[in-house]
Amino acid sequence: MNAEGGNLHREFEITWGDGRARIHNNGGLLTLSLDRASGSGFRSKNEYLFGRIEIQIKLVAGNSAGTVATYYLSSEGPTHDEIDFEFLGNSSGEPYTLHTNVFSQGKGNREQQFFLWFDPTMDFHTYTILWNPQRIIFYVDETPIREFKNLERHGIPFPRSQAMRVYSSMWNADDWATRGGLVKTDWTKAPFTASYRSYKADACVWSGEASSCGSQDSNPSDKWWMTEELNATRMKRLRWVQKKYMVYNYCVDKMRFPEGLAPECNIS
Protein backbone atom coordinates (compact mmCIF):
# COMPACT_ATOMS: atom_id res chain seq x y z
CA MET A 1 0.00 0.00 0.00
CA ASN A 2 1.31 3.44 -0.89
CA ALA A 3 -0.26 6.65 0.41
CA GLU A 4 1.79 9.16 -1.56
CA GLY A 5 1.71 12.64 -0.06
CA GLY A 6 -1.67 11.48 1.13
CA ASN A 7 -4.80 13.54 1.47
CA LEU A 8 -4.94 13.96 5.23
CA HIS A 9 -8.76 13.84 5.24
CA ARG A 10 -8.53 10.38 3.72
CA GLU A 11 -5.64 9.08 5.82
CA PHE A 12 -6.41 10.42 9.31
CA GLU A 13 -9.21 10.96 11.79
CA ILE A 14 -9.12 13.60 14.49
CA THR A 15 -9.53 11.84 17.83
CA TRP A 16 -9.57 14.59 20.44
CA GLY A 17 -9.17 18.31 21.04
CA ASP A 18 -12.64 19.82 20.59
CA GLY A 19 -11.77 21.80 17.45
CA ARG A 20 -8.09 22.31 18.24
CA ALA A 21 -7.08 19.81 15.54
CA ARG A 22 -7.89 21.02 12.04
CA ILE A 23 -7.36 19.88 8.47
CA HIS A 24 -6.74 22.68 5.95
CA ASN A 25 -6.04 23.18 2.24
CA ASN A 26 -8.37 20.40 1.05
CA GLY A 27 -6.49 17.81 3.07
CA GLY A 28 -3.00 19.15 2.42
CA LEU A 29 -2.21 20.39 5.94
CA LEU A 30 -3.15 19.34 9.47
CA THR A 31 -2.55 21.48 12.55
CA LEU A 32 -2.65 20.48 16.21
CA SER A 33 -3.03 23.16 18.87
CA LEU A 34 -2.64 23.28 22.63
CA ASP A 35 -4.05 25.83 25.05
CA ARG A 36 -4.58 25.80 28.80
CA ALA A 37 -7.84 23.88 28.43
CA SER A 38 -6.74 21.06 26.14
CA GLY A 39 -4.36 19.65 23.58
CA SER A 40 -5.38 17.73 20.46
CA GLY A 41 -4.58 14.66 18.41
CA PHE A 42 -5.25 12.47 15.40
CA ARG A 43 -4.66 8.89 14.28
CA SER A 44 -4.46 6.98 11.02
CA LYS A 45 -7.54 5.23 9.72
CA ASN A 46 -5.38 2.28 8.66
CA GLU A 47 -3.48 -0.13 10.86
CA TYR A 48 -0.11 -1.34 9.60
CA LEU A 49 2.06 -4.39 10.19
CA PHE A 50 5.47 -3.24 8.89
CA GLY A 51 6.21 -0.34 6.62
CA ARG A 52 8.07 2.89 5.99
CA ILE A 53 5.96 5.75 7.29
CA GLU A 54 6.90 9.40 7.05
CA ILE A 55 5.38 12.81 7.64
CA GLN A 56 6.64 16.37 7.51
CA ILE A 57 6.31 18.40 10.72
CA LYS A 58 6.90 22.05 11.57
CA LEU A 59 7.18 22.51 15.32
CA VAL A 60 6.08 25.32 17.65
CA ALA A 61 8.29 28.41 17.31
CA GLY A 62 9.40 30.65 20.16
CA ASN A 63 8.89 29.62 23.77
CA SER A 64 7.56 26.06 23.55
CA ALA A 65 8.75 25.01 27.02
CA GLY A 66 6.52 22.40 28.66
CA THR A 67 4.88 21.32 25.40
CA VAL A 68 5.25 17.99 23.62
CA ALA A 69 4.40 17.20 20.00
CA THR A 70 4.31 13.49 19.18
CA TYR A 71 4.34 11.25 16.13
CA TYR A 72 4.38 7.52 16.79
CA LEU A 73 3.13 4.05 15.93
CA SER A 74 1.23 2.09 18.55
CA SER A 75 -0.96 -0.95 19.01
CA GLU A 76 -3.53 -1.17 21.81
CA GLY A 77 -3.75 -2.91 25.16
CA PRO A 78 -1.49 -3.50 28.18
CA THR A 79 1.10 -5.46 26.15
CA HIS A 80 1.15 -2.95 23.31
CA ASP A 81 4.02 -2.24 20.94
CA GLU A 82 5.03 1.36 20.22
CA ILE A 83 7.65 3.29 18.22
CA ASP A 84 7.96 6.93 19.34
CA PHE A 85 9.09 10.29 18.09
CA GLU A 86 8.39 12.95 20.74
CA PHE A 87 9.47 16.57 20.39
CA LEU A 88 10.08 18.21 23.77
CA GLY A 89 9.72 21.99 23.66
CA ASN A 90 12.10 24.49 25.20
CA SER A 91 12.55 28.14 26.10
CA SER A 92 13.13 30.60 23.26
CA GLY A 93 16.57 30.15 21.74
CA GLU A 94 17.13 26.74 23.33
CA PRO A 95 17.05 23.59 21.20
CA TYR A 96 14.17 21.15 20.97
CA THR A 97 14.90 17.68 22.33
CA LEU A 98 13.91 14.79 20.06
CA HIS A 99 12.93 11.88 22.31
CA THR A 100 12.73 8.35 20.85
CA ASN A 101 11.55 5.13 22.45
CA VAL A 102 10.61 1.57 21.50
CA PHE A 103 8.04 -0.49 23.41
CA SER A 104 7.64 -4.22 22.91
CA GLN A 105 4.95 -6.23 24.69
CA GLY A 106 4.19 -3.27 26.93
CA LYS A 107 7.76 -2.61 28.04
CA GLY A 108 9.62 0.55 27.06
CA ASN A 109 12.44 2.28 28.96
CA ARG A 110 14.51 2.39 25.75
CA GLU A 111 14.86 6.15 25.45
CA GLN A 112 17.43 7.86 23.29
CA GLN A 113 17.33 11.65 22.99
CA PHE A 114 18.90 13.98 20.45
CA PHE A 115 19.34 17.62 19.63
CA LEU A 116 18.75 18.42 15.97
CA TRP A 117 21.27 19.97 13.60
CA PHE A 118 18.70 22.52 12.38
CA ASP A 119 15.86 24.62 13.80
CA PRO A 120 12.73 22.42 13.46
CA THR A 121 10.43 25.43 13.92
CA MET A 122 11.56 27.37 10.85
CA ASP A 123 10.34 24.95 8.20
CA PHE A 124 8.91 21.48 7.63
CA HIS A 125 11.23 18.50 8.07
CA THR A 126 10.61 14.83 7.32
CA TYR A 127 10.46 12.29 10.15
CA THR A 128 10.37 8.62 9.13
CA ILE A 129 9.84 5.32 10.92
CA LEU A 130 11.08 2.23 9.07
CA TRP A 131 9.71 -0.93 10.67
CA ASN A 132 10.29 -4.37 9.24
CA PRO A 133 10.81 -7.85 10.73
CA GLN A 134 14.56 -7.28 11.11
CA ARG A 135 14.86 -3.74 12.45
CA ILE A 136 13.37 -0.36 13.31
CA ILE A 137 15.14 2.73 11.97
CA PHE A 138 14.35 6.34 12.89
CA TYR A 139 15.19 8.87 10.17
CA VAL A 140 15.25 12.68 10.18
CA ASP A 141 15.34 14.11 6.64
CA GLU A 142 16.60 10.70 5.47
CA THR A 143 19.47 10.78 7.98
CA PRO A 144 19.26 7.73 10.26
CA ILE A 145 19.51 8.64 13.93
CA ARG A 146 18.69 5.33 15.61
CA GLU A 147 18.43 1.63 14.80
CA PHE A 148 16.74 -0.99 17.00
CA LYS A 149 17.44 -4.50 15.71
CA ASN A 150 15.42 -7.67 16.10
CA LEU A 151 17.36 -9.65 18.70
CA GLU A 152 14.66 -12.19 19.53
CA ARG A 153 17.26 -14.97 19.23
CA HIS A 154 18.76 -13.46 22.40
CA GLY A 155 15.38 -13.45 24.14
CA ILE A 156 14.70 -9.74 23.59
CA PRO A 157 11.11 -9.00 22.49
CA PHE A 158 10.66 -7.20 19.17
CA PRO A 159 7.48 -5.59 17.78
CA ARG A 160 6.42 -7.88 14.96
CA SER A 161 3.02 -9.41 15.71
CA GLN A 162 0.74 -6.47 16.59
CA ALA A 163 -0.59 -4.10 13.95
CA MET A 164 -0.11 -0.43 14.79
CA ARG A 165 -1.75 2.85 13.86
CA VAL A 166 -0.02 6.18 13.38
CA TYR A 167 -0.83 8.65 16.15
CA SER A 168 0.06 12.27 16.73
CA SER A 169 -0.73 14.70 19.52
CA MET A 170 0.07 18.11 20.95
CA TRP A 171 -0.12 18.25 24.74
CA ASN A 172 1.15 19.83 27.93
CA ALA A 173 3.82 17.91 29.83
CA ASP A 174 5.43 20.65 31.88
CA ASP A 175 5.78 18.28 34.83
CA TRP A 176 8.68 16.59 32.99
CA ALA A 177 9.26 17.76 29.40
CA THR A 178 11.63 20.71 29.78
CA ARG A 179 14.68 20.37 32.04
CA GLY A 180 12.94 17.64 33.99
CA GLY A 181 9.93 19.84 34.73
CA LEU A 182 11.84 22.87 36.01
CA VAL A 183 10.59 25.09 33.16
CA LYS A 184 6.80 25.43 33.01
CA THR A 185 4.51 26.25 30.11
CA ASP A 186 3.96 29.98 29.55
CA TRP A 187 0.24 30.06 28.79
CA THR A 188 0.42 33.70 27.68
CA LYS A 189 2.03 32.31 24.50
CA ALA A 190 -0.88 29.92 23.79
CA PRO A 191 -2.16 28.54 21.53
CA PHE A 192 0.87 26.43 20.65
CA THR A 193 0.52 24.93 17.17
CA ALA A 194 2.41 22.20 15.30
CA SER A 195 1.78 21.58 11.59
CA TYR A 196 1.81 18.31 9.64
CA ARG A 197 1.82 17.61 5.89
CA SER A 198 3.08 15.27 3.15
CA TYR A 199 2.18 11.98 4.80
CA LYS A 200 3.49 8.90 3.02
CA ALA A 201 3.00 5.25 3.99
CA ASP A 202 4.73 2.50 2.05
CA ALA A 203 3.35 -0.19 4.29
CA CYS A 204 1.45 -3.42 4.79
CA VAL A 205 -2.14 -2.54 5.72
CA TRP A 206 -3.67 -4.82 8.33
CA SER A 207 -7.38 -5.58 8.08
CA GLY A 208 -8.53 -7.79 10.91
CA GLU A 209 -6.82 -11.09 10.15
CA ALA A 210 -4.88 -10.39 6.97
CA SER A 211 -2.10 -8.16 5.66
CA SER A 212 -2.07 -6.47 2.27
CA CYS A 213 1.45 -7.91 1.94
CA GLY A 214 0.29 -11.44 2.63
CA SER A 215 -0.29 -13.01 -0.78
CA GLN A 216 2.39 -15.50 -1.74
CA ASP A 217 2.28 -14.66 -5.45
CA SER A 218 2.80 -10.92 -5.05
CA ASN A 219 6.07 -9.40 -6.21
CA PRO A 220 8.38 -9.00 -3.19
CA SER A 221 10.07 -6.03 -4.90
CA ASP A 222 6.81 -4.15 -4.35
CA LYS A 223 7.47 -4.42 -0.61
CA TRP A 224 11.04 -3.15 -0.57
CA TRP A 225 10.63 -1.76 2.94
CA MET A 226 10.46 -5.32 4.29
CA THR A 227 14.19 -5.76 3.67
CA GLU A 228 15.49 -2.18 4.00
CA GLU A 229 18.71 -1.87 5.99
CA LEU A 230 21.47 0.66 6.46
CA ASN A 231 24.30 0.59 3.95
CA ALA A 232 27.84 1.64 4.88
CA THR A 233 27.25 5.29 4.01
CA ARG A 234 24.15 5.51 6.17
CA MET A 235 25.80 3.64 9.03
CA LYS A 236 28.53 6.27 8.96
CA ARG A 237 25.88 9.00 9.06
CA LEU A 238 24.13 7.27 11.98
CA ARG A 239 27.37 7.17 13.96
CA TRP A 240 27.96 10.86 13.19
CA VAL A 241 24.53 11.81 14.57
CA GLN A 242 24.92 9.67 17.67
CA LYS A 243 28.38 11.06 18.40
CA LYS A 244 27.51 14.73 17.87
CA TYR A 245 23.83 15.07 18.76
CA MET A 246 22.77 12.29 21.12
CA VAL A 247 22.14 13.76 24.59
CA TYR A 248 20.70 10.72 26.39
CA ASN A 249 21.11 6.98 25.89
CA TYR A 250 19.42 4.40 28.13
CA CYS A 251 22.24 2.00 27.30
CA VAL A 252 24.76 3.94 29.40
CA ASP A 253 22.53 5.11 32.28
CA LYS A 254 23.73 2.91 35.13
CA MET A 255 22.30 5.29 37.73
CA ARG A 256 18.80 4.69 36.39
CA PHE A 257 19.30 0.95 35.91
CA PRO A 258 21.45 -0.17 38.88
CA GLU A 259 20.28 -3.77 38.41
CA GLY A 260 21.91 -3.81 34.99
CA LEU A 261 21.46 -2.28 31.56
CA ALA A 262 19.00 -3.69 29.03
CA PRO A 263 20.39 -6.86 27.41
CA GLU A 264 20.43 -5.36 23.90
CA CYS A 265 22.90 -2.75 25.14
CA ASN A 266 25.59 -5.42 25.41
CA ILE A 267 25.07 -6.87 21.93
CA SER A 268 26.86 -5.15 19.08
From Swiss-Prot:
Q: Name one GO molecular function term.
A: hydrolase activity, hydrolyzing O-glycosyl compounds
Localization: Cytoplasm
- Catalytic activity reported: breaks a beta-(1->4) bond in the backbone of a xyloglucan and transfers the xyloglucanyl segment on to O-4 of the non-reducing terminal glucose residue of an acceptor, which can be a xyloglucan or an oligosaccharide of xyloglucan
Q: Indicate the residues that form the catalytic site.
A: 82, 86
Q: What class of enzyme is it?
A: transferase
Q: List the disulfide bonds.
A: 204-213, 251-265
Bilayer-spanning residue ranges: none
PTMs per UniProt:
Contains at least one intrachain disulfide bond essential for its enzymatic activity.
Q: Where is this site: Important for catalytic activity?
A: 84
Keywords on record: Cell wall biogenesis/degradation, Cytoplasm, Disulfide bond, Fruit ripening, Glycoprotein, Glycosidase, Glycosyltransferase, Hydrolase, Transferase
Domain GH16, chain residue ranges per copy: 1-196
> Has keyword Cytoplasm?
yes
Which signals induce this protein?
In fruits, up-regulated by gibberellic acid (GA3) or by cold treatment during storage.
Example GO CC term: the record gives: apoplast
Q: Where does xyloglucan bind?
A: 86, 99-101, 109-111, 175-176, 180, 256
Glycosylated residues, chain numbering: 90
Q: How does activity depend on pH?
A: Optimum pH is between 5-6. Activity decreases sharply when the pH is lowered from 5 to 4.
Q: Origin, by domain of life?
A: Eukaryota
Q: What's a single GO BP term from this record?
A: xyloglucan metabolic process
Q: What is its EC number?
A: 2.4.1.207
> Glycosyltransferase: present as a keyword of the record?
yes
Pfam families attached here? Answer: Glyco_hydro_16, XET_C
User: What family, per the record?
Assistant: Belongs to the glycosyl hydrolase 16 family. XTH group 2 subfamily.
| Described function | Catalyzes xyloglucan endotransglycosylation (XET). Cleaves and religates xyloglucan polymers. Does not catalyze xyloglucan endohydrolysis (XEH). Probably involved in cell wall assembly and synthesis in fast growing tissues and in the maintenance of firmness in mature fruits.
Q: What is this protein called?
A: Xyloglucan endotransglucosylase protein 7
